[in-house]
Amino acid sequence: MTTTRRATIEDLYETAGKAEIVNGELVLREPTGDEPGFAGDEIFASLREHAKRTKSGRAVGDNKGFRVHLPNRDSFSPDAAFYVGPRAGMKFFEGAPQFAVEVRSENDYGENAEKRLAQKRADYFCCGDAGSLGRGSPRSQSDQVLPVK
């Protein structure tokens, strides 16, 4: 008999690629294509310029983890973000970013994607995120949920 347990941040550290913990499950996200990747990069570059100009916060690019403490979510990994908290060294950032961006990929359209996006936006705001540009889906049709054993 196989039993599964709730995924932990430590599981994320051992997972290759981009992943988040949602409802206790480790959710892997597929790499994105040219256009959504370029859009995320451009937003990161704008946030980086803002951080340099204002000497406040940090622009955070894709594939970085933010550790949060919600009943249904333990982490975020936005496509771009602005963070004002302490440096985290080799670990995930603690808490949600001040501003987060999710860029919509090819499979991130339709009614179910809109519902997931609305839930992820609500999760960001519950964690203290001051703004979220929801141009993507927290889980597209191509994402994979892994059981944690």
Give names to the regions the model predicted:
Residues 1-149:
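Gly/Pro/Ser/Thr-rich low-complexity, intrinsically disordered segments predominantly at protein N-termini
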